[in-house]
């Protein structure tokens, strides 16, 4: 899109995203559903040997198992779910631990938890991640970049994207820091980059007189204190189970002091506003630019969303979000419902079809990630 028509479309998109204005006069409000959430709690922790940090960073993940393949796979048993949701923690000094978890449901009317007896918990080719016309929008200007929701997107020193989900926490894709066997080179000194204005000499601050002297944006980096990666990714990376658990949480050494976006349980695709998802990331083909896009969900499984949002390596780890009505508070709210993972070529009725894939935040994954953030399951009762 170029020229005046393209500019007008871009301005309309930014108005809808930034000002929370809907381009459609819908007579109903898509509402965040209420879920009865499980509880994922640590049971035992084991110290592990220090890992090698020699894996090459992969900025995308590919799989030949598409929607029909995944739909034909049975949901994990209770014991399998516990194995997949157990997790590895890496600390800044290079030490690591493995934590086994239990899965519970909260007894009605009680503040205690009880054990849950059961839980339903291609072919090589050039990867095409741009579909038809490139529908991505580079976001320029500090008035947009430094304000919500775009300000929640951050860059990882390994080359991926992450999203601020709490005062000190960043959600990203597991493959950005771990290849399924060991940690990516540079993970021990992992940093998270925040866009901020770069001023010419003698300028500074956010007042109007100095804002005219803004030269460009730059990254300010904060070190990561520890990371959590589910064992479903580590155990399952050799097969298509791993794709379902391609997410990780990073804890920063200090608060970032920005507005963040909460996580939420992913509703069924038919309940999403317009059937669409949104995400912003640092695609490698537009270095230094934050790139926003939105598109329709084409298909879904219990753990994955299949879509054809235009994306390039570097966007992996972006938080996939939607904006829906929160009935108790009587307000609109955006929530992260998934993590952009990568690209798939799949066989659809004998014809090759490619998708970009996002990992859905299911009730179990929500309980796990929320506990990583809060450290108290009682604070994780609302998805």
UniProtKB/Swiss-Prot annotation:
Transmembrane segments: none annotated. One of its GO terms (biological process) is proteolysis. PROSITE patterns: TRYPSIN_HIS. The keyword NADP does not apply. It is an enzyme of class 3 (hydrolase). Disulfide bonds join 160-176. InterPro entries: Glutamyl_endopeptidase, Peptidase_S1_PA, Peptidase_S1_PA_chymotrypsin, Trypsin_dom, TRYPSIN_HIS. Its EC number is 3.4.21.-. It is found in: Secreted. Coiled coil: none annotated. Residues 1-23 form the signal peptide. SUPFAM superfamilies: Trypsin-like serine proteases. Its main location: secreted. Glycans are attached at residues 93, 207. This is Serine protease 23. The gene is Prss23.
